[in-house]
């Protein structure tokens, strides 16, 4: 395992730990999810480039599309919760309320 792969896995692990520690605030959770997606993108790109597997060249692009969709939905949810409740607590996202 090269130093680059170890750094990427460390970034993913730190984002995962951040997600577990700061899960009460929606903004912190979204930032940690973005860090996880970015490290997965870099890891997938490096893996495909090092293995010379040409059929999987679209996988990092597809991962970026899903990350952009996740970010857009997350920011829309953050704006809605902030306007409705005045805070960005995840506890405000109770789906049983109408």
Curated annotation (Swiss-Prot):
One Pfam family per UniProt: Oxidored_q2
Keyword Transmembrane recorded: yes
Transmembrane segments: 1-21, 29-49, 61-81
EC number, UniProt record: 7.1.1.2
GO cellular component: mitochondrial inner membrane; respiratory chain complex I
Membrane topology (UniProt): Multi-pass membrane protein
InterPro entries in the record: NADH_UbQ_OxRdtase_chain4L/K, NUOK/Mnh_C1-like
UniProt catalytic activity: a ubiquinone + NADH + 5 H(+)(in) = a ubiquinol + NAD(+) + 4 H(+)(out)
GO molecular function, one term: NADH dehydrogenase (ubiquinone) activity
Family classification: Belongs to the complex I subunit 4L family.
Function: Core subunit of the mitochondrial membrane respiratory chain NADH dehydrogenase (Complex I) which catalyzes electron transfer from NADH through the respiratory chain, using ubiquinone as an electron acceptor. Part of the enzyme membrane arm which is embedded in the lipid bilayer and involved in proton translocation.
Assembly: Core subunit of respiratory chain NADH dehydrogenase (Complex I) which is composed of 45 different subunits.
Name listed for the protein in its UniProt record: NADH-ubiquinone oxidoreductase chain 4L
Organism in which the protein naturally occurs: Balaenoptera bonaerensis (Antarctic minke whale)
